[in-house]
Amino acid sequence: MNPLEQLVTQAQTDFAAAIDAAALENAKAKYLGKTGQITEQMKSLGKLAPEERKAQGAVINSAKEKIEAALTARRDALSNAQMEARLNAEAIDITLPGRGRGTGGIHPVMRSWQRVEEIFGSIGFDVADGPEIENDWTNFTALNSPENHPARSMQDTFYIEGKDTQGKPLLLRTHTSPMQVRYARMNKPPIKVIAPGRTYRVDSDATHSPMFHQVEGLWIDENISFADLKGVYLNFVKAFFETDDLQVRFRPSYFPFTEPSAEIDIAFGSGPLKGRWLEVSGAGQVHPTVLRNMGFDPEQFIGFAFGSGLERLTMLRYGINDLRLFYEGDLRFLKQFN
């Protein structure tokens, strides 16, 4: 065996003995580095005659290729072994039982929404739906709010660039009453409907949010009175709070879409809120102008309407003091209701 063949055999042995990439690089330097044995052999060619240099160069190149092939093979083997070890370390025992999936829950405001629909549905009220982007006429004008009404200002209402197909300004609805207008213009009396949904106003503090939920109710017929309104709402709050031990009072107030108008307060007969009058709703007899805008003759039909904030009802039902808790997504808070 000539010296170059012995060199190849020795290189293959050294590469095979390398147990990691660092050891392999050290072995490579011994043969193929700047001062490696193959490199020194290549440098010695300059001392040979041209014909001998050509022949010896071919032999050295052949030896170099064999050494490089052995190096590549060992490098691949080490890489594969490292990958296999990592996969074995990360292996999953497929015989282990699976992890149970966490179940979600209904948001407390949505629970109140569902509860309101159940209560009013049980006494014959339909549920209306409608767009959250409304036009100026349906949100304000149809409800007897003139163009100079302060609620139309940019400080209270989120306006949207552009107009609808009829050239009316667009905005995010400030209450769910527009759904009642749309429902009434598409149906004939008797009308009994509630309109729950999201609403938007420029407001944000511990008791107000720029986005909040309302439920409004409307009853239009020929022979109803304010006494019917009182009876319906009294039965509703007793069912919602699941107690007969409460009082309800109506205070005179003003709303452009009802006349007469009232604020509705309740007082619990027991619990931490015992004896305190708490505002829960605005209500009243539908204004004649609003009835006309709905397409009804106020001389023939009469109606009453009411509206409550779902967050407000939920806060009273569960004893929550800060409205912002509903929107922070804190699971420690939300899990208490599921």
From Swiss-Prot:
Major location (coarse): cytoplasm
Mind telling me which InterPro entries this protein's record contains? aa-tRNA-synth_II, aa-tRNA-synth_II/BPL/LPL, Phe-tRNA-synth_IIc_asu, Phe-tRNA_ligase_II_N, Phe_tRNA_ligase_alpha1_bac, Phenylalanyl-tRNA_Synthase, tRNA-bd_arm
GO CC, sorted alphabetically, is: cytoplasm
Where it sits in the cell: the answer is:
Cytoplasm
Cofactor details (free text)? Binds 2 magnesium ions per tetramer.
| GO terms (BP aspect) | phenylalanyl-tRNA aminoacylation
HAMAP family referenced in this protein's UniProt entry, alphabetically = Phe_tRNA_synth_alpha1
Family statement: Belongs to the class-II aminoacyl-tRNA synthetase family. Phe-tRNA synthetase alpha subunit type 1 subfamily.
State whether it acts alone or in a complex, and with which partners, per the record.
Tetramer of two alpha and two beta subunits.
* Name assigned to this protein: Phenylalanine--tRNA ligase alpha subunit
